[in-house]
Amino acid sequence: MRDSNHRSLTSNKPIVTITSTVYDRRALDINSSIPLINSLNYLTYLTSNSSKVRETVANDGALERLVSILRSCHLSLFELLDLDLENFNEHENIKDLWKEKRLALCAWKWTLTFQCLVLTGTRGTEQIRKKVVMSGVLSVLVTVLDNYLLYHKNYDFIKDQTMTFDFKGITTETMYKFMRKDENETYQQYIEFITGQDKLKLSTDKNFLNERLVAPSMTIPTDFSDIWGRFADLASNFEPDQERHDDDIDIDSEVESENFDAHKNFFSQPDINRPTISTPREFFLGRIVPKQDDVIWSLQLLAFVSKYTYMKSTLQNVELVESLSFRSMAYKIKQRISEENDLEEQERDVTVKLSSLYPYLSKNPENNSKVKALDTSKMDPFFKELEELSNRCQQEEQNEICNNHCPVLNLFERYRVPKPSDDNAYGKDKERINLRKKISDNFERRWSYDKMKKELTNIVYKNKVLTNVVNIFPLVEKYTVSAENTHDVIYWSSVIMRNSCRKNEILGVRQCANFSCGKWEDFPRQFAKCRRCKRTKYCSRKCQLKAWGYHRYWCHEVGSSHMRSTNTTTGVNTPNEPSSLNATATTAADVSNSTSTFTPNISTTVPDEISNRDENSIPE
């Protein structure tokens, strides 16, 4: 395949792609979507069947590149508002096709990259799984699980409650009219507030389309834009011949003009029967909506990673990916709702105070204007003080304006002619050195790092620490609820929760299973075990009662059929021998201490290559 847009300008040549028999790391460093999707398609097949490829991927930096691809699978605010398609407003069909193609390519990159990471982690060795964790994939997994609860369940797991508004409906017209800051706020400004401002300011230039500074490629979306522009110019300049007076010629010219107008409006008319581009994932405000497959893949990878106790501290401190997460949107909506509630309370308080001061306001509306003419001596002392303060501030502002705009009587009044001296340069340097020394001494006298307060304030701690760092285990615990999830989701989430109860292999102590507590044992066997499952430990009866609300969904009695099935299975597939990915699990990640090689239910047949065509061409 050939493409001129390569990350490395020195390697601007025909693109290297991954095939079913050859793995090449350079194929992952391209920006063009179609060749990259082809390479990811074959890489999914290779990582599922070849242990050598999995080991190579873990050591050549491909894991970090795959994670960066996942983090980039979203639409910027520039693309979300369709500002890159402003010149194609008259061609609705082409505009819709381009939007569908852009979403489809982004979704396919997400799906295939996710599969590559999951297959590498679930089928790899312990060292490979450690590399997978170090690549930063945990942030993506937590974001997927959190987004699924926010979007599909309308549930905030951090506050452990259902949200007071419909998250899916924040883009509707009704929600926009209810949530907008004022009547002057447009829908575009409302979307900008929800999704967050871009670091690059949105341009109002009409020719900004040709620059494409924010778009992934530096070309116009389609090669037909110039043709359509000429076609429109031809339509504006087209006029029938005015010199012909023959009736037949007039009739023919009218027919030709009608046909021409019909062809002119061809691109602007919506085509109901046109084929649509299939997209494996939906998008909401430019961000991918996770499906149940994404949840299962995330839980499977976490199940194999969480069985290593030395990774528990890493799993308990994971940051969400801001560009992919829905949590920032939900937080801004809650903030807007709280601001409106505060304004309503303030208006209510002011109304109550005015009604108490002037009881006749509500009874005689026609006499309300008399309040303005009340004598200041009869006003409340607090309001009188506020009025005096306001008058004083206005007077100070007027005085400051007058002082700043005072006319200059003599233009050379402040001009100073330097005296001729041989030591002028030396004197300036000496003054500069003295000034620098004075500033340094003043800084050292007033500032000391030893005496500086290093504690974070409550506001900074809540906004910068608590909101960004997430504990995986209480999030996964929400997926163990049997009434809300499928069998696969319940199984893998239960595996992760049982892995969280493992004791530290170095110290031999366990952590309290109440995640809001998180206390560790001072010595082995200090805490009491759950009498039913004999796995979880609690530091007190209070913690056990508090955690039972969700622990009861994954608490299996010792000797039950579930425990026997997980303890008696011994089959382990060797990494060197490819096995069918559609087979069921032969070992549980929470029981086996060896390298488990269960693979998710992902198709690994040799993929068909996508048609070799330019990324900017119109999809058929």
UniProtKB/Swiss-Prot annotation:
Subcellular location: Cytoplasm
Protein name in UniProt: MYND-type zinc finger protein MUB1
UniProt GO BP: establishment or maintenance of cell polarity; protein ubiquitination; ubiquitin-dependent protein catabolic process; ubiquitin-dependent protein catabolic process via the N-end rule pathway
Segments forming MYND-type zinc fingers: 514-555
Primary localisation category: cytoplasm
Gene Ontology MF terms in the entry: zinc ion binding
Family recorded in the similarity comment: Belongs to the MUB1/samB family.
Compositional bias (Polar residues): 563-606
Organism listed in the record: Saccharomyces cerevisiae (strain ATCC 204508 / S288c) (Baker's yeast)
Basic and acidic residues compositional bias, start-end: 610-620
Region spans: Disordered: 563-620
Subunit structure comment from the entry: Interacts with UBR2 and RPN4.
TM spans (from-to): none
InterPro entries per the UniProt record, alphabetical: MYND-type_zinc_finger, Znf_MYND
Domain notes: The MYND-type zinc finger is essential for the ubiquitin-dependent degradation of RPN4.
Domain of life: Eukaryota
Keyword Metal-binding: yes
Record: residues binding Zn(2+): 530, 533, 551, 555
Task performed by this protein: Involved in the determination of the onset of polarized growth. Required for the ubiquitin-dependent degradation of RPN4. Cooperates with UBR2 to transfer ubiquitin from RAD6 to RPN4.
PROSITE patterns in the cross-refs: ZF_MYND_1, ZF_MYND_2
The entry's keywords: Cytoplasm, Metal-binding, Ubl conjugation pathway, Zinc, Zinc-finger
Keyword RNA-binding appears in the UniProt entry: no
Note: Present with 125 molecules/cell in log phase SD medium.
One GO CC term, this protein: MUB1-RAD6-UBR2 ubiquitin ligase complex
